[in-house]
Regions:
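ATP-dependent adenylation/nucleotidyltransferase module used to activate substrates
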Residues: 1-163, 204, 220, 238-248, ...
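Short, aliphatic-rich beta-strand segments
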Residues: 47, 212, 218-225
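Short, structured loop/turn "capping" segments at alpha-beta junctions
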Residues: 153-159, 166-175, 208-210
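Internal, active-site/partner-interface "lid" segment
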Residues: 171-191
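Short glycine/threonine-rich loop-to-helix capping motif typified by GTGT followed
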Residues: 186-192, 226-230, 263-267
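Short amphipathic alpha-helix segments
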Residues: 189-209
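C-terminal boundary motif of the adenylate-forming
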Residues: 208-214, 254
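Short, conserved charged micro-motifs
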Residues: 228-238
């Protein structure tokens, strides 16, 4: 048994202790792997719960639905209008805490009403190294993080996902659309829609790991891996036309490249 198999076995032991679990499922790399493991371990005692908000891109909503159908797991949906939450809309540095608290409280209640007392999420070892106030909300609500408890890193999760033929094994890391707007700048539905449409257009050019950070509501700062900067320059005219058409007065490219949580630098 190799190291990955040992970690997966440990994950199954943890899930078995819960008996019945609901997985907070977004359709991303981590939650898809966790949902697969929960079903593999618990069968019908695994449930998926997806939170739907304006900060979740439409393609991810559709992807989550399709993955549940593929895995044969029952799914519940918890809708939340996050733009009605003052602590989300005003975008303070601890925005993620308030949003996660509301989302996971709702998903936990929904799961418990369906007979699943434990809600688990896809946090892993790598998530402990960045500024993540949302993890405090999970701890307060008693949300369990079995991937973290089993010592699984992002690389482990991708490797095991590939081993189990999960289509998300090489999917780019995702984050809610609100993470594209600098702290202190109000979040609106219009800004979230602009970012989503801009990123969808750029993804259509073949760019993979990318972010469109929206500064001041009208300056787009595009982040892509350095090796993909040439693609951006090749399509420069079309990118400028499209993003200005969406409402951006200025279209820029960050020469530092894609950086996870780059807006946390100012904290």
């Amino acid at each position: 048994m190799d190291a990955l198999e040992q970690k997966y076995q440990r994950l199954q032991e943890i899930l078995t202790q819960f008996g019945r679990v609901a997985v907070a499922f977004s359709g991303g790399v981590d939650s898809t792997f966790l949902l697969y493991a929960a079903q593999d371990t618990l069968g019908g005692n695994a449930l998926a719960v997806t939170a739907v908000t304006a900060a979740l891109p439409q393609r991810e909503r559709q992807g989550a639905e399709a993955l549940c159908a593929q895995l044969g797991v029952r799914r519940l949906v918890y809708p939340l209008d996050v733009l009605t939450l003052p602590a989300f809309q005003t975008n303070p540095p601890d925005r993620c805490y308030h949003c996660k608290r509301a989302l996971f409280q709702g998903m936990l209640t929904l799961a418990q009403e369906a007979g699943f007392p434990t809600l688990v999420d896809g946090s892993n070892v790598d998530d402990t190294g960045d500024y993540r106030p949302g993890m405090r909300a999970l701890a307060e609500l008693g949300i369990q993080s079995p991937l973290l408890a089993a010592g699984l890193t992002k690389a482990d999760i991708r490797a095991l996902s590939h081993r189990f033929h999960l289509p998300t094994w090489d999917q780019p890391s995702a984050a809610c659309l609100a993470s594209r707007i600098p702290y202190g700048e109000a979040i609106t539905g219009e800004k979230l829609a602009l970012v989503e449409q801009a990123e969808q257009f750029l993804a259509g050019l073949g760019l993979t790991q990318l972010r469109v950070r929206l500064h001041g509501g009208n300056l787009a700062r595009i982040e892509v891996p350095p090796e993909q900067l040439e693609v951006v320059l090749t399509h420069r005219t079309g990118i400028v036309q499209t993003l200005t058409g969406l409402g951006c007065a200025y279209v820029t490219v960050d020469l530092a490249g894609y950086q996870m949580g780059s807006l946390n630098k100012v904290l």
